């Protein structure tokens, strides 16, 4: 069954797509771009902590008067697309278990020929603190539970649940950062979390050559995270750096960066496990 009418509709036949951190910022922009590309019989799973913005996004993506979470065809941009919301705090064991259970329930359906998992959920940590201020193991462990553990656990769960299918394609995207490659003052947690995730997904690419793996650094985005960076970072030089990015209008609109990621996925020529930055493309 080939492509359907409409702009981009049906380009990706029967895809199971999962986006974490989908309620705002880059994740929301990406979900809005992906939905019209997902053809009949596709599933879009939106994962985030906050239920209300997720539900609002799901309603928008289905089209007004679209179906409930249990599927059926939507009215507008994505005919035949099921949208499921999973509200879960991925930093807690209970939330991670709930998210994993949803993936185990939804992904094994045999008609999906493609899996796309986008690990976008993440946080900055307390960037007012220097390295020497980070003495509380509970604070450190909770940061890595959300930013590293959940990405590893959900990715392995999703790949296991989807399984290996003849002729199918499986793609895993990690939303990375320049901070995975370069240290920044006061950002010990964020930089080490991003570096850890990049390496983790490089190992996945090595172990599973049939899975396409991409570490995509979206550039400095005009989001709430950037607002925190320029107001809360402990180091004055770093605060000034982020302030000047805003003042010189060098922050990137989320939709512009998300579109570059979609282009990368559609071209599908990246080396598996590669770190690709917005400015490389």
State the predicted function of each range.
Residues 98, 102-105, 115, 127-146:
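Active-site Tyr-X3-Lys motif and surrounding loop/helix of classical short-chain dehydrogenase/reductase
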Residues 39-57:
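Conserved glycine-rich Rossmann-like NAD(P)H-binding loop of the short-chain dehydrogenase/reductase
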Residues 211-219, 223, 231-281:
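C-terminal helical subdomain
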Residues 61-66, 75-94:
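Rossmann-fold cofactor-recognition segment
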Residues 51-52, 87-102, 137:
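The beta1-alpha1 cofactor-binding region of Rossmann-like NAD(H)/NADP(H)-dependent oxidoreductases
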Residues 64, 77-83, 102-119, 125-126:
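A glycine-rich helix->loop->beta "capping" turn
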Residues 21-24:
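Conserved glycine-rich cofactor-binding loop
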